[in-house]
């Protein structure tokens, strides 16, 4: 899995420079996990058409490799232009919870809604190892009057039912699990490494 960087890291700026300087945490057969330094995890949504004001993405890239994914282009901001690199190079925002604790103030949010997982799946395989999403939920469980929505294709979300309940006691929380098709063969073609439709339906029953 070669990275197609064409310029030295010293000439890159912003997120591209951070991506080039990222340390490799783990190399798997089909993906590489890298640590990504970030200054902020709360991103304001500029579109009035969206039902949320803020977004949080615990990772950059997504190992599920959905063929129709609209977020693949975001890797281009880091100088990664090959289609497959979105699922091959997964950037881990390991310090995200500490940063969110600083950013998550009543004055800033004022009851506004947060969408978790708009450009990545917050429960992709990396989450089992690094638990960035769980650490973010732990921070949000301490807040009040949030509007949190989570979108995922993974049954791993059921692991965090304890934190989702805590958040629900103080705020509004909604979990959406995408089930594109019940045809397992077609799902494997469209959503290469995502959990099977049966596992997702079972997660919905559990929730």
Regions found by a protein language model. Name each.
Residues 1-26:
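Polybasic, low-complexity association/targeting segments
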Residues 24-59, 67-176, 180-188, 196-206:
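Conserved Radical SAM active-site core
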